Curated annotation (Swiss-Prot):
Species name: Dictyostelium discoideum (Social amoeba)
Signal peptide: 1-20
Main subcellular location of this protein, as a coarse class: secreted
Gene Ontology CC, one term: extracellular region
The entry's keywords: Secreted, Signal
Superkingdom in the source lineage: Eukaryota
High-level lineage: Eukaryota, Amoebozoa, Evosea, Eumycetozoa, Dictyostelia
Location of this chain's protein in the cell: Secreted
Protein name: Putative uncharacterized protein DDB_G0290419
Length: 104
């Protein structure tokens, strides 16, 4: 479900940003930029939620330690990680579809 929502969101952003056809490289760049911006936003949210001093601690912890160290934020961290992974996957699918359409 998250993948479909992410795919639709990316498609909407890309359609709104250019009304004509754009090259596959431009599509790839825009899509990857969108995911990178989402990752930066997620990092900012995480920093805000747990505090800047705990970010390094989080990065050094194994996943099970996450639950113990930051139980109140664990679910949000996992959800954001899944969203970012689905963003990358949605980008790849969108680019593959564009390549397929280009060669037809």
């Amino acid at each position: 479900m998250k993948f479909l929502v992410c795919l639709l969101l990316i498609a909407a952003v890309l359609i709104n940003s250019a009304m004509g056809s754009f090259s596959i490289l431009a599509l790839k760049h825009q899509c990857k930029s969108y995911c990178a911006n989402a990752e930066n936003y997620a990092q900012d949210l995480l920093t805000e939620a747990v505090g800047a001093e705990n970010i390094q601690l989080i990065q050094n912890h194994a996943e099970n330690d996450f639950k113990n160290s930051f139980p109140q934020h664990y679910e949000k961290i996992v959800e954001m990680k899944e969203y970012l992974e689905s963003c990358e996957h949605a980008c790849d699918s969108l680019i593959q579809e564009e390549i397929f359409n280009y060669f037809q």
